[in-house]
Amino acid sequence: MRQIMEIAMHPSVRTCWNCNPGEVMNGSIKHSWEMLREFQGQVIHIHDLYDDKYPYRELFGLLKAMNYGGYCLSESPATADPVRVMHYYRMLFSLLTSPAGAAKS
């Protein structure tokens, strides 16, 4: 992907981080993230935030470090109560962006 971005090299061409298992190496996304960080656009594609197989806390820390102000798109199963699910996501966002172990109420 980095090679594609280097060839494209245009300010309108950006990546969308997709939270795929293939970018996790030894439990971390740091290496993959650093390869593409300079090309990151304003969209992140997330899956279920409760899934501990993906290092979401690390991702949110990296986003916070770059003052990310974009959007997070959630790919999650359909629900009969989307407002309730959004409240859960809001709480998870708060937990994932707070210092490790700290919970906001």
Regions flagged by a language model, labelled:
Residues 1-105:
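Histidine-acidic metal/acid-base catalytic patches
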